[in-house]
Amino acid sequence: MLLETDASRNKPSSYIPLCGSDNSCGGLWCPRKGGKYSCISMTCDIQEDCPKLVRCKDSPGPYCMEGFCTC
């Protein structure tokens, strides 16, 4: 029996967005193409979901709070 994993789709951490927080943003403040930033929301079920989706700049985290990743 062959077990298939997602290992082939794993990307280095440099491909995971480096986000932060902003007082006017209720989600994550993340860079977009062209150097602009935008407020985005990433859902999560468990704490281990968030580090696969986002990295946090200048703050601990990311962590899952009330179903959303936050820094």
From Swiss-Prot:
The keyword Disulfide bond applies. Disulfide bonds join 44-64, 50-69, 56-71. The keyword Disulfide bond applies. It comes from the Eukaryota. Keywords: Antimicrobial, Disulfide bond, Fungicide, Plant defense. GO terms for biological process: defense response to fungus; killing of cells of another organism. Belongs to the DEFL family. This is Defensin-like protein 292. The lineage of its organism: Eukaryota, Viridiplantae, Streptophyta, Embryophyta, Tracheophyta.
